Each structure stands twice: as C-alpha cells, then as structure tokens.
Amino acid sequence: MNVLCDRHHDGLFYSLQLLFENRLGGTVYTPIGHDWWDAGYWRFGEQYGDDRLARQFLDAGPFEYGVAYDPHHPERPIHGITLDEARALPWEYVVATAQDNQTGFKKFADEVGAKFVLAVGNRSQFIDWNLDPLALISSEVDIWARGVRVHQEFDQRTFGYRDPDEATPVIRSFINCFGGMPCERLQRAMVPMLPEFTFGIHGIDGQDGNIETVSEIAALMARSAFGYHDKEHGDGFGHVIHNWASIGRPLIGHRMHYEGLMAEGLWQDGVTCIDLANRSLEDSAAMIRDIWADKPRYRAMCEAIRAEFEKIDYDAEAEQIRSLLEGSLVAA
C-alpha cells in the first residue's frame, strides 16, 4: 500500500508515518522536486506570490528518494518521490496536510485512482468539504462530512513517563518564536521571582537554542521541573504540550488559551498545572516554589498530568481511522 503525503510539519508527518506504516502496513512517500509545484499539485505558500516554500520543501537535497532521514527523528527514513516516479506507482491514499495543497492533491488522487485524505492539525484550518476528503481532524475544526477527530501519535518510548526524581529545578519552554508572543513578557517578569530556578527557552528563536532531535527534547523535559507553555492562540493539536503530559511534568501557563482545544484537559489548576490567570504573578511564583519543595505534592501533579494523557486511546482511534479509510464509517 503506497501513501503520498506532503510534509510541512515534522511532528504531523511523523504521526502519519506511524499511522500508515506502523499501524496500517503501508509505505509513506513525500513529494520532491519542483515539478510538483509547476504542475499545480503542491501549492503551499502560494499566497506569498512566489515559490519560496516550494523551494524550501520540494527542492532536491535532504529528501532524496529513499535515502533521507528526518533530522527530528533521525532513525526514521523519509521516502522522497518525484512527480514522474509518482505517476508510475499505484496509490491507495493521497494525503494533504497543508491547507493550500488540498485542491492539488485531490486532483492528483483523482488522476491516479487513489482516495483523498486531508489531515488537519492547525487551528482554524480551512477545509474544502466540496472536495469530499476523508478527514483526519486533530484540532478544534468542525467536521461536516466524512471525518474523525483523533490525536496525533508520537513515539511513546521516547516520550514515556519519567520519574519525578529525575527532575531538576529548571523551567523550560519549547515554544517556537516565543520571544515574539505577548505571553513571553510574563515569563520574563517571572524569572527574577524564582532565583532558585533556571529557565531554559528553546525552540526557533529561543534564547537557549533550538533542540533538533525529539530524543534530546525528551531528555531535557525529563530533567525539567515544569513545562512553561503559554501561547495566546493555543495549539491545533499541540505536540509539545502533549509531550510534556506524556513525560509527566506539570504545566505553567493560561488554561483559557486552550478552552475548546485538543489539550484543554491537560489544564487543571493545582492538579496538572499552575494557571497564571487564577492568581497574581507573584502568587504563581510562590505556588511553583511551594509545589517544588513539597515532593509528594509535586509527584502527584506529575502523575496527574500523565494520567490525563493516558485517556488518549491511540489503538481505538486507529480503528476509527481504519473504518473511515475503508468506507465503513458513515459521514457526520
């Protein structure tokens, strides 16, 4: 079973590899080469009026056919395929993840006799239901036709629960471009209130550097006392926030940013997180200090957020997806 899937977000693409390869027994390929853009199939970034994202994601280089490895998951091969090569293969599914690619990928699916799948992981992502996709929704977006709401899977061995005794007095963030967000000002204001803690700000543009591999991220999370995850616009699915929960480290941030979103259940003030909206910044800092000093209380919070994560049943969701793909799940 061959599956064609665009790749614009490494966590989402990896989750689709786990689904279509590990669970469903197929092989996932991703487009490579500018021909995909020239032929009108790949349109991600066309709103910029040029092909900058096509050159970033499609140009030959790191994703040569059959030999590339994901820099974030270096053990996982990425099978790149040119347009000419793709036209010569049989396809079961053609999967678009970028909003701009849905029309072109639907066209390619029709041409090769494949089923068209749309995997949605971003907030407020537009779905053209007139294309009649089989929709895998891992955000708050409404489902109006054939689709299921699921959580994006990630490697449970890498992000397995880690004993709270491994944690050190470090508060870390892995939010990309955090410095440009309004919530970052609160984080900076909190730093002098907690001199006994070290703060690590990672991710793209992070002052402490971007961490490339997920294994390194998991190791740093395990050695952290808390995950600082405060994003005014929340997340579609939210790989980082679910990684924190899987490893078992309490969150710091605003619950209100996640109301109605996939990660809402991870925000329970005093149980799984410190909700900055419920008290002053000074009182929040004092609460963080008190929780860290009270090891049984801290352990209980680590266990509580892990227990909340364990409510996700990836096996059951995979069977829902299988039913959707095979046609036994009716439209919403």
Feature roles, as predicted:
Residues 219-236, 249:
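Acidic donor-binding loop of glycosyltransferase active sites
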Residues 229-242, 253-265:
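Nucleotide-sugar-dependent
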Residues 5-9, 33, 95-101, 119-123, ...:
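Structural motif
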Residues 152-217, 240:
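Conserved catalytic-core segment of nucleotide-activated headgroup transferases in glycan assembly
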Residues 279-282, 292-329:
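A charged, aromatic-enriched C-terminal amphipathic alpha-helix characteristic of glycosyltransferases
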Residues 1-107, 111-112, 276, 314-332:
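N-terminal pre-catalytic "stem/leader" segment of glycosyltransferase-like enzymes
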Residues 117-162:
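Donor nucleotide-sugar binding/catalytic pocket of nucleotide-sugar-dependent glycosyltransferases
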